[in-house]
């Protein structure tokens, strides 16, 4: 789900989608429920639709910028 204005202020980020349930390749790569996906392949995301569009343009992997609490890190997630 998209971040609320309050969450954006608390996390100090203007973009992001909250992971409500981690499954499949994302979960295997280490993404957890409660993480915030800030960008995919260096493209900021604010909605599931934006995330799907980036994934559709990707080949075999997506570089996911994750924010967990105050820490940001990249997670490579294989596609397919």
Residue ranges and their predicted role:
Residues 1-80:
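C-terminal recognition in membrane/secretory proteostasis and scaffolding
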């Amino acid at each position: 789900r998209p971040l609320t204005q309050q969450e954006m202020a608390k996390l100090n980020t203007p973009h992001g989608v909250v992971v409500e349930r981690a499954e499949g390749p994302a979960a295997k790569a280490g993404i957890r429920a409660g993480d915030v996906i800030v960008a995919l392949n260096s493209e900021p995301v604010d909605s599931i639709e934006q995330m799907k569009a980036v994934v559709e343009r990707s080949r075999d992997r997506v570089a996911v910028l994750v924010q967990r609490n105050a820490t940001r890190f990249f997670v490579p997630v294989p596609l397919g």
